[in-house]
């Protein structure tokens, strides 16, 4: 349980020491006329899918908020290696105002709030819309609405962690706005405490809807429902690689692993409450226990990746350790983009441009000096270089993610 909860509750403690006043006025993009986009239920589906695509962009979770800028400021890369780019070197030193880092920081802020603007537009339009517009009526309308609320909470929370001090430092400080309306006007900044309350309010409104859909209305997409004895491995396959398992409802209601689902909500709620401080710890415990007791111990919808899936041949290895992933965004070219960033244009290069720092000092060896930790021996690659020796295998393509996404 400790390992699972640590995965759920981990939060980046660093903050970006930049002024964001100049970026508060972010005008929403409106590429398609509202009357056209929101005139059908399929238009709402397309709008939500477009938001997921934007979340997976390079500026956000497709790069900078996963293996890019965020990994650099959390000291994962060896900034002393001569192969690392100036941007990652500066970010690793927590220097945010250089010619290399400042554009990245600005793009994260602007793209994050543009995604929020699009979510607000979707939320405001779907609220008064009659359920008859949707193929699956109230359930479909509510699902789209709840996912949009949850994504708005998630995006705001990550912007808070990046652009404001930790809650314990100054909870009454006001650093950035919580935008819950679709408008171009500058919005007053919230205190950290009020900001977190707004995050939790969005999650609370979405919680019962997602719970009902994922555990009662259509649980078939959350676990290996067609198997006599489902395992965490096959449950993960159903969520992330639905493929031939899709029923008559269609792909939009499957692939729940790459859509914000009820398990993801419980995990995010626990993280937010831990970040918020002692007054919220009980709520964090409640969410984490439900996730662990119900969906790990009882239903086994999630679990730990078996050793045989890690120690096998690299081409078959589950380097994402995927059986307990609650939610992930789909990006078709992720492996290609990461390979290009690590090795450059030369397929024969043996020098990584994103070398991991402090390896193998992070892992213990046995009394003979041999390292037996699977994370080091099977999930981290090595080169013959000294300062650029180690690199992650996490983004190596694995069998679990080879089938096409519904948005291909």
Please provide the spans of the model-predicted regions.
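Bacterial Sec-dependent N-terminal signal peptides
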Residues: 1-29
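A short, hydrophobic C-terminal helix/tail in secreted or cell-surface proteins
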Residues: 404-408
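Membrane-proximal, proline-rich intrinsically disordered regions
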Residues: 20-74, 331
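Aromatic-residue-lined binding/catalytic grooves and analogous aromatic/hydrophobic interfacial grooves
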Residues: 21, 262-263, 268-302
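Short coil/turn linking the two alpha-helices of tandem helical-hairpin repeats
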Residues: 160-161, 167, 275-278
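Conserved, well-structured interaction surfaces
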Residues: 45, 53, 85-163, 183-197, ...
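Elongated scaffold/linker segments in the mid-to-C-terminal portions of large proteins
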Residues: 100-103, 212, 222, 228-234, ...
